[in-house]
Regions:
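Extracellular beta-strand ligand-recognition surfaces/modules
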Residues: 1-19
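Short, charged low-complexity linker/loop segments at the C-terminal edge of domains
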Residues: 21-30
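Extreme N-terminal leader/anchor segments
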Residues: 30-95
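Short, solvent-exposed helix-helix connector turns and helix-capping sites enriched
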Residues: 62-66, 163, 263, 388
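Short amphipathic alpha-helical segments that mediate assembly, nucleic-acid/protein binding
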Residues: 67, 71, 267, 391-392, ...
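Aromatic-lined, polymer-binding surfaces characteristic
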Residues: 76-377
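Extended polysaccharide-engagement surfaces of secreted carbohydrate-active enzymes
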Residues: 320-454
């Protein structure tokens, strides 16, 4: 057990001590073991990532305005354009976002802003995902609960409704999190999956970072660097590909980290490293590695996983492509091609909105998924100089099918910040933007496609 680098002494408080004959590798502190594997496996080497020197072979330089374009696109994706729209789906998303905010504010009422004399938060202990639900009959409060249900609604309430009390509560929660171990270099026992259930923290940070003091901003940036594993971007991997979990949950948070660095040169280094990382992550992965395969199917857990993981990773990759397009940090033409062909292939092997039953992994009831990729079609199509005709035509056939209307409506109505936060107003605005183009929908897809890496 080590004190923080800037501290020579202190007091350790133990909230819960458990003696157990067996500890799952998923529940042990990632800082305690040495990772011998060099591939992109599920065993993340947090300490190696943290200690990697922030450098790249060739820095891609950019003007402040060019970087601002990326940040502005991301902000608009979160908050919407602010323009009045009569579109029913935009209105539906806005209405359900309001419900999401109100629900979060109600849950946040139980959190009282209180500090001790030493300026530490006066609050109950917080526990990671791997901790028991109760101890001696007492319900435990976990980081994940606040991450998923409270942080993002508060941040949206401040940005959209200018509620200063919501801002104050988020800043208090950041202090509370930090006091309980949510910090740079902290293991908390479950980093393996804690990082995947932290979307509320990541996205609230971007929305509120301009309101943070310089000291608080620096503290949270270091925390963000740790939990997003941004250090992977500075490393040179042995092969193309990336774990779908790390794409769907951490691709946008990695970009948030890079955009939030104040020093101009360091920001350019980080954005260059991120662009290189994403180009490699969305490359064609060999063998059983994730995620994109040579036949433009997708792997996770060393096999096809079309009900989850893979489509989520496609979504994240497509969104990154849109945010970076037409800037010095735009993803490569090869990466755009991979995303385009992967989306077209996904729609080809779907029956209606359903993926083949033999490719659903451990989610037998998760066949219906194609409607959740409609925004990804829009992101990639709009990343070209002109909307891509093939993607747009495929998108419109799915969108305009009467049999798909209810599923699409359900998707638009659902707003949450679970594993990955995607249910934004900006998402639906881009979807409707592509829908309004003059490109006609494609005919019903037919023919034969040989997918050598999917065995049904």
């Amino acid at each position: 057990m080590q004190f923080p680098q800037e501290t020579k002494e202190g007091v350790i408080f133990i909230d819960f001590l458990e003696f157990t004959p067996k500890v799952s590798w998923q529940n042990m502190s990632d800082a305690q073991y040495k990772v011998n594997r060099k591939d992109y496996s599920l065993v993340s080497d947090f300490v190696s990532y943290r200690n990697t020197t922030p450098q790249v072979k060739k820095i891609i330089t950019a003007e402040d305005q060019q970087i601002k374009i990326i940040a502005d696109r991301l902000t608009t994706w979160y908050l919407g354009s602010g323009q009045q729209s009569s579109d029913k789906w935009i209105k539906m998303r806005e209405d359900n976002e309001e419900v999401f905010i109100r629900t979060g504010l109600k849950a946040a009422q139980k959190i009282k802003i209180q500090y001790n004399e030493d300026n530490t938060p006066k609050a109950e202990p917080l526990f990671p995902m791997g901790a028991p639900t109760t101890i001696e009959g007492q319900q435990l409060k976990k980081f994940r609960t606040i991450n998923e249900n409270i942080l993002l609604p508060l941040a949206l309430d401040y940005r959209k409704n200018h509620n200063v009390q919501s801002l104050k509560k988020v800043l208090y929660i950041y202090d509370w999190f930090n006091d309980q171990g949510w910090a740079d270099g902290s293991g908390m026992g479950t980093l393996c999956f804690e990082k995947l259930r932290s979307s509320g923290y990541f996205h609230s940070f971007f929305l509120l970072k301009e309101q943070l003091s310089p000291e608080l901003l620096e503290r949270e940036l270091q925390t963000l660097n740790w939990f997003t594993m941004f250090g992977t971007c500075y490393q040179t991997p042995a092969n193309a590909g990336e774990v779908a979990d790390n794409l769907r949950a951490l691709a946008i948070p990695k970009l948030i980290y890079a955009l939030s660095i104040n020093d101009k040169q360091k920001k350019q280094v980080a954005l260059t490293a991120f662009k290189n990382y994403m180009d490699n992550a969305l490359g064609i992965a060999p063998g059983f590695f994730g995620t994109l395969k040579p036949d433009f199917s997708g792997y996770h857990h060393r096999g096809p996983y079309n009900s989850a993981y893979y489509p989520h990773a496609l979504y994240a990759g497509a969104l990154i492509a849109y945010l970076l397009h037409d800037t010095p940090y735009a993803l490569s033409e090869s990466t755009l091609h991979n995303l385009k062909q992967s989306l077209l292939t996904f729609r080809f092997f779907c029956a209606g909105l359903n993926v083949p039953a033999g490719t659903v992994g451990r989610f037998p009831k998760g066949q219906q998924i194609l409607e959740t990729l409609l925004p990804a079609f829009a992101y990639v199509s709009l990343s070209y100089k002109k909307p891509d005709k093939e993607l747009t035509a495929a998108f419109k056939r799915i969108l305009e099918s009467g049999s798909n209307r209810q599923a699409i409506t359900n998707y638009v109505s659902n707003v949450n910040s679970n594993l990955a936060y995607t249910s934004t107003v900006g998402e639906i605005e881009l979807l409707t933007q592509l829908a309004s183009t003059s490109i006609s929908k494609e005919e019903k897809v037919n023919g034969t496609l040989f997918l050598s890496l999917i065995h049904i």
